[in-house]
Swiss-Prot record:
Residues 114-173 are annotated as: Disordered. Residues 119-142 have a biased composition (Gly residues). Homotetramer. Residues 5-111 form the SSB domain. GO terms for molecular function: single-stranded DNA binding. The gene is ssb. InterPro entries: NA-bd_OB-fold, Primosome_PriB/ssb, ssDNA-bd. GO terms for cellular component: nucleoid. One of its GO terms (biological process) is DNA repair. This is Single-stranded DNA-binding protein. The keyword rRNA processing does not apply. A motif (Important for interaction with partner proteins) lies at residues 168-173.
Length: 173
C-alpha cells in the first residue's frame, strides 16, 4: 500500500484564455484558471444555490502545453488530473504569500478536452518531457484522426510521430 497519494481530478470550465510563457531555455509553461461549480436547493427557501470554486492550473509538461496553446480557449470544458502543490513567494512589500495550484507535469498528468474543438474534432497528444538528450523531448502533437468526442492528452506519452489509431483493433479487451 502506498504511503500517501497526491492526486487532483477536476472537471470544469476554463475562465480565460490560457497564458503561455517560456523558461529561459525555451520550455513552455501554461497557466489557466478552471471553474468548478456545485448546485443545491436551500432547505428553508427552496431556492437554487450555486457555489463556484476557481482553481489555478499550471502545466509544465511540454506535450500538454502544446495542446493547451493550440486548442484550449476560454469556456472550454476540461478534465484534468494533476498534483496539488503549494508554493511560497513574496509580494512587492516583502510579505510571504502562498499559492496552491494543480500542477500537471511528468507522466502522471492528464488533460482531456470534453467538449471538442470549435471545428468539432479533438486534440490528442503523447506529450511528455522524457529528460536527457533523446529525440522524444517534445512529444506527440495533434492527431487529426481522433474521435469527435473530444481529445485526450496524457502526460506520459509516446515518441513524436504517435501511433496509428487502427492499432486499437488488435487489443483483446
Amino acid at each position: 500500500m502506498a504511503g500517501s497519494v497526491n492526486k487532483v481530478i477536476l472537471i470544469g470550465n476554463v475562465g480565460a484564455d490560457p497564458e503561455i510563457r517560456r523558461t529561459q531555455d525555451g520550455r513552455p509553461i501554461a497557466n489557466l484558471r478552471i471553474a468548478t461549480s456545485e448546485t443545491w436547493r436551500d432547505r428553508n427557501s427552496g431556492e437554487r444555490k450555486e457555489k463556484t470554486e476557481w482553481h489555478t492550473v499550471v502545466v509544465f509538461n511540454e506535450g500538454l502545453c502544446k495542446v493547451v496553446e493550440q486548442y484550449v480557449k476560454k469556456g472550454a470544458k476540461l478534465y484534468i488530473e494533476g498534483q496539488l502543490q503549494t508554493r511560497k513567494w513574496q509580494d512587492q512589500t516583502g510579505n510571504d504569500r502562498y499559492s496552491t495550484e494543480i500542477v500537471l507535469q511528468g507522466f502522471n498528468s492528464t488533460l482531456t478536452m470534453l467538449d471538442g474543438r470549435g471545428e468539432g474534432g479533438g486534440g490528442r497528444s503523447g506529450g511528455g518531457d522524457f529528460g536527457g538528450g533523446n529525440d522524444y523531448g517534445s512529444g506527440g502533437g495533434y492527431d487529426q484522426q481522433s474521435s469527435p468526442r473530444g481529445g485526450s492528452s496524457r502526460g506520459g506519452g509516446q515518441p513524436s510521430g504517435g501511433f496509428s489509431n487502427d492499432m486499437d483493433d488488435d487489443i483483446p479487451f
